[in-house]
Regions:
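Short, small-residue-biased leader/transition segments that mark boundaries at the very start
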Residues: 1-6
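Terminal alpha-helical anchor/extension segments at protein ends
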Residues: 8-16, 26
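Switch II of P-loop NTPase G domains
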Residues: 9-12, 35-51, 224-227, 246-259
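Short beta-strand elements in bilobed, periplasmic/extracellular small-molecule ligand-binding domains
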Residues: 19-37
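Hydrophobic "anchor" residues on beta-strands that sit immediately upstream
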Residues: 27, 60, 81, 239-240
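Accessory, often N-terminal, substrate/partner-engagement and coupling regions
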Residues: 47-121
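Long, charge-rich intrinsically disordered scaffolds of nucleic-acid metabolism proteins
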Residues: 97-160
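Conserved G1/Walker A P-loop phosphate-binding module
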Residues: 133-143, 147-254, 258
Length: 259
């Protein structure tokens, strides 16, 4: 029924995301039961995945969901393979595509927000294993390093958010100036890779006739993360500002919504 269609669509989208990250998909499988808190899928299914991955000579296991730090670690330990979840994959794509300073900072914030819970989870696991009280002097070297990494990540997040807040203030000022100019703004919105850039380019060529002002078109999810604005005049004395935007996608990491 509809649930199966949604699942198939989501898996097809994951394959496209993998291709966008220059990965070759060699196999896939679906589990219908509830999520296993320890290893995401059931023990039998994970064993099947491990065997099929070995037969297919796969280098990476890619999960169509966000994994918890413990799930990620347990799956890696059980299979002996590199493991990536959907959130990390999308973050990798955004990191490789971001061009503007603001987009790069936003991607870094999202990556750090994704990393911090993993550092905290590993830190807690080490604390339980060692039975430490929490003071730096009583901790092992691995636990101390995790604590330092966590503090550095928190400090960097604070710094990035401060810089992004300054950029947001500047952008709001520019938006107010544009609002006073009374020029209408039109944004092309829709799913990623749905053809927004194609529409943008057809309008640019029709009303501007300048190929240098077209945007990149590529049959790939998130081919570009930069919003492009062009001033066009579809009717005499009726100028509009046309924007090509980053597209929508399912399960987008919350920290990337503003990119």
């Amino acid at each position: 029924g509809s649930e199966m269609c949604i699942r198939d669509s989501s898996m097809a989208e994951l394959a496209e995301l993998a291709n966008a990250c220059e990965m070759e998909v060699v196999g896939s499988c679906v589990q219908h039961t509830q999520i296993n808190k320890a290893i995401y899928v059931g023990p039998g299914k994970l064993g099947q995945i491990r065997e099929e991955a070995e037969e297919l000579q796969a280098d990476l296991l890619l999960f169509n969901d966000s994994l918890t730090p413990s799930q990620l670690r347990n799956i890696q330990d059980d299979t002996g393979m590199a493991v990536m979840d959907r959130t990390t994959l999308i973050l990798e794509i955004f990191a490789s595509r971001a061009k503007s300073r603001e987009a790069m900072l936003q991607v870094e914030v999202a990556r750090l927000q994704s990393l911090l819970p993993r550092l905290v989870g590993l830190h807690d696991a080490l604390s339980r294993q060692g039975g430490t009280s929490g003071s730096m002097s009583s901790r092992g070297s691995g636990e101390k390093k995790l604590e330092l990494d966590r503090r550095r990540a928190q400090s960097r997040l604070t710094e990035l958010r401060r810089e992004l807040a300054e950029m947001e203030t500047e952008r709001r000022t520019q938006q107010k100036k544009r609002a006073r100019s009374a020029i209408p703004r039109v944004a092309l919105v829709g799913y990623t890779n749905a053809g927004k850039s194609t529409i943008m380019n057809s309008m640019v060529m029709r009303y501007l006739g300048d190929a240098e002002k077209t945007v990149m078109e590529k049959d790939m999810l998130f081919a570009t993360l930069d919003t492009t604005v062009r001033s066009i005049t579809p009717k005499e004395n009726k100028t509009v500002l046309l924007s090509d935007t980053v597209g929508f996608i399912d399960k987008l990491p919350h920290g990337l919504v503003t990119v």
